[in-house]
Amino acid sequence: MEDHGYAYSVLEKLSFNRVAGTEDEKKAAQLLLSEIEQAGGKGELMEFPIPASTVTQEGMRIVSPYAREVETIGYGRSGSLPEGGKTLKFYYAERGVAEDYVGMDDLSDTAVMVNSISYEAYRLLCEKHAAAFIVMRGFHYDTLETANAYRKNLGDEKIRLGRIPGFMISAKDATEMVRDGVETVHLTLVQNEFEATSRNVLAVIPGTEYPEESIALTAHYDSVPV
C-alpha cells in the first residue's frame, strides 16, 4: 500500500469524536499506539489530568412578550444556575464592548447576548455581574444543526475572571429574538465538574545518520471543544 493510502486508512479508523478526557479519546490513543507497534516501532501512553464537565440539564424558554422554546447548548465549565432554572431580563449587547453598555452597571438580573465571546467581551460581562451570557452560532439562516454547533468549554483565562453560566443558540433564533423584542427568558443549566484523564502518544524513531540528534514532531489526535 502506498503511503498516502495507508495514511487515509488510519484517518478512516479515527473518524469518530475523540473529545479529550473521554473513553473515545483513549480508544483513539490505543489505536495510534497499535499502528506504531505494527510498523515495528515502540510507543507509550503518557497520561495527565484535565478539567472536564458534564452538562445534565440545559434549556432556554422565551417568557415574554411571547412563549417559545429555544434550542440551546450550555457552555461546559461555565457554572450552573439554581435548580429549576432562572427567569432573567434579556439584553442584546451586540459586540459586547463598553459602548454597548452605556448607562448599564449592574446586570445581575440579566442574560446578555453577544455576537461572540472574546476575552474582552467576557471581562465586561464579569465586570457588569451578568447573570448569564448567550452567544449566537452560524449565519442568520442557520439552525444549531446546520451551523455544526457543538458544546464548548469556557477557557481557563476566562474562568480566572469568574464563572458566568453560558449558552449557545443559533443565529437564526438570535435574529428572531432581537427582531421580536424578547424581554425575558427562562434559562436552565446544571453541570458537574470533575478531573478527567487525557493522554499523549509518545513514539521515538531512532535516527540512522545522526542518532544523537532529535527532531520533535507533534500533532493533536483528539477533538477539543474550545
Please provide the spans of the model-predicted regions:
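Surface-exposed, flexible loop/turn segments at secondary-structure boundaries
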Residues: P51, E120, G138-Y141, A174, ...
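Catalytic-core environment of secreted peptidases
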Residues: D3-E23, L32-K42, A111-N115, A132, ...
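Noncatalytic luminal/extracellular "stalk/propeptide" segments of secretory-pathway proteins
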Residues: M1-G5, S9-A111
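Extracellular/luminal Protease-associated
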Residues: T22, V70-I159, R163-P165
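Soluble metallo-hydrolase cores and metallopeptidase-like ectodomains found primarily
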Residues: R77-E99, R151-V226
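A generic structural signal for nonpolar/aromatic side chains embedded in well-ordered alpha-helices
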Residues: K13-L14, L125, M177
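Short beta->alpha linker loops
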Residues: K27, S116-I117, I169
